Regions:
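Active-site-adjacent, His/Asp/Glu-enriched structural segments that form or flank metal-binding
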Residues: 3-107
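Short, surface-exposed glycine/acidic/tryptophan-bearing loops
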Residues: 110
Length: 110
């Protein structure tokens, strides 16, 4: 799912959801970046584009099973961990990122 799947006039949901995916799940309630750092992961992030949302990380081989478990957990058990506070916080972050992009040369073209 990407931004092309959003109704006209109601954009930003895919990007907001991408951000929420890093805020913990029902079984792993801490910030997802914390778990990745503890595993020795590098190059971790998420991106949202017109036709997709990506999540990626590079983990040491001994941490692969744990990383795959965390991925499956956040894909299946995110909803119960989303609080109004997390939603409000990430909404502000995404709005800020959009403003920064709009202020770049060509930012409003996309």
């Amino acid at each position: 799912v990407g931004s092309k799947d959003e109704p006209k006039g109601q954009t930003g949901f895919a990007h907001l959801f991408e951000h929420l995916m890093f805020n913990g799940s029902e079984n792993a309630p801490e910030d997802y970046f914390q778990y990745l750092a503890e595993m020795g992961a590098t190059d971790y992030n998420g991106t949202t584009w017109f036709d997709r949302t990506n999540y990626f990380q590079t983990v040491p081989k001994p941490a692969l099973e744990r990383a795959l478990w965390l991925e499956s957990d956040r894909m299946g058990y995110l909803l119960g961990a989303v609080t109004q506070g997390k939603l409000d916080n990430q909404r502000g972050v995404v709005q800020n990122e959009k403003r920064q992009g709009d202020n770049q040369p060509g930012g409003l073209v996309y």
